Amino acid sequence: MSSSNSSVAEAYAIYSELYAVPKKVGKTVITAKSGKTTRKCNLTVKKYVNPIASVKVGNSTIAGKKFDTEAYRVVSYSRFANKKAKITFNLKKGWSFVDGVSYLQKNWMKSEDVKNGAVIPIRGGSGFVVITNVVNDKTGQQEAVMLLFK
């Protein structure tokens, strides 16, 4: 795996999955090689845009403005430890879910997918993650929004 412009994005593979980590706004070409086969993909990194109106975790609401500069929020694990909480991502107008919502424990090698607004068991200790991928309906820009329970 390689990136033609490593200052824009870093590319790497773990097991059979390929990753590109954005570093700054710009364009790069990601190249993946396997044996005699080479595949290339153009990647455009855009400036982060907040897609969140609010997030509800149990009875608590996280204001959308908390996501203005970063696509993640740290939530108190001890407050929800070993409980089930309904988690709902409320998106701003013009944004849609790519898939549903995924959650995983820090030591899992898998994740579980559920619908937005599902009741999720918060367990496994600090490092529990809830994540969703969303897309801007007009521009096609995608953002991964995450709750990290610490």
Language-model features, listed with the residues they occupy:
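Extracytoplasmic soluble-region selector
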Residues: 1-150
